[in-house]
């Protein structure tokens, strides 16, 4: 647990599409890497080396700098038993911690309910992006979902008198009426939570000042929004965003596309950390970066297809930086139908963050007891 008096906060950056683990943290010293990747590989002279065996893709230079400062944990071989190679199903498993069945509650939704069982803070969980990720969804749990924090709010762009009158109408419309039943009570409660959350969040930009210049892309701007919300101290404990939908699904043109994506993501992570430090807000923030699966070991000529074992990152001032877990073997006999085997269950990763950082019992959130790691 953090020593700061402020509550610990978790930010999550989801890399949708299935990030290629082999070309992210590269086993450059293993001849089987070059053998399996005749067209889609990073040459050894470009690798940002960690040790005599593995290193970063050069596009992750900003994250490598943070790693060298001891602020990044690399989690190798992350996955789950009997992997599913469907984007939708695999992401659903990561979101709900339910590999054997379709779950209806997200792991962070359950965590929010544990932290705030009466829903007293409508901003305990906030998502930046379109829709609401299933990871944050749970019955009766209020979560704000924001497309653009700079323009977020209720009825922005009209004068105060008109806005107050309209909000009064909305308030009465959402107020529960006698005899409406449980469904309408829930909807009216949710509607009022949305109004409250929008009003509070709309003040975040005015509370924010920074010299950090984020990139002109959606990941960078959402990470900036996360920083703004965290710095505003609304009592938010979980902040979430997603890289552009399925952008990491690199079936073709991977050498250019994958590097460009990581260039944006790694710069955004660096700027996020710098922003928090400048605003004295880094000590109670940890960032988790994950993807739903890795890619096939052998390339397809221009890209890579859906695989299994992947890589995750945990970033922050309180992180015990380093490499955690073993790199899955590239030997053909040790592959899982041509994919990397997982050796770290993602629910152990979640459990580590929930118990050692957030400070809640993870078993009911992730659906059991899983081996935790030492990065916190």
Model regions: which residues?
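Feature for exported/extracytoplasmic and membrane-associated proteins, marking the mature portion
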Residues: 1-279, 311, 315-376
